[in-house]
Amino acid sequence: MSKEVLSKSKEKMEKAEQALTRQLGTIRAGRANASLLDRLSVDYYGAATPVNQMASISVPEARMLLITPYDKTILGEIEKAILKSDLGLTPNNDGSVLRLSIPQLTEERRKELVKEVKKEAEEAKVAVRNIRREANEELKKLEKSGDITEDDLRSYGEDVQKLTDESIKNIDSITKDKEAEILEV
């Protein structure tokens, strides 16, 4: 039962790390990345449909995204959605595809993005700490019910802390890599 608590905690912590990686992938770092458009949806026959499900998104150059819709009639809607979004990008519509040029980031914008990255990382760390707290509470319940001894509680508590430390270290590494990518000129 207590090993189950550890494995569930490890799984949840890994999910928190993966969520951070996905979230940081949507932050524009001056390089073209198809995940920039992940949060973008277009009204398609009355349903909000993600752009990546209605178009092929490729990266032909380091600073350009090429959006080729499967249905050419939706091209204008995708263009409007990009213009309305907070991406700050202007699409170039040539009638069959959209080209998105990713401009160089200003120093000020880089600093804003680094702050955003740190905020996201802190939220991930809080999530990991909450998972640790839940695991410790679960272990204490097991000890109270007599399923594990006090020594086991201490030992498993140390294991939970090791998992937490490892996860926080991974989050710091992910964050550091993203910050370096943003600050790279």
Swiss-Prot record:
Annotated Gene Ontology cellular component terms: cytoplasm
Main location per the UniProt record: cytoplasm
InterPro entries with a match to the protein in the record: Ribosome_recyc_fac (IPR002661), Ribosome_recyc_fac_dom (IPR023584), RRF_sf (IPR036191)
Key word RNA-binding present: no
Keyword entries, A-Z: Cytoplasm, Protein biosynthesis
Superkingdom of the organism of origin: Bacteria
Protein's recorded name: Ribosome-recycling factor
Organism: Listeria monocytogenes serotype 4a (strain HCC23)
Upper lineage: Bacteria, Bacillati, Bacillota, Bacilli, Bacillales
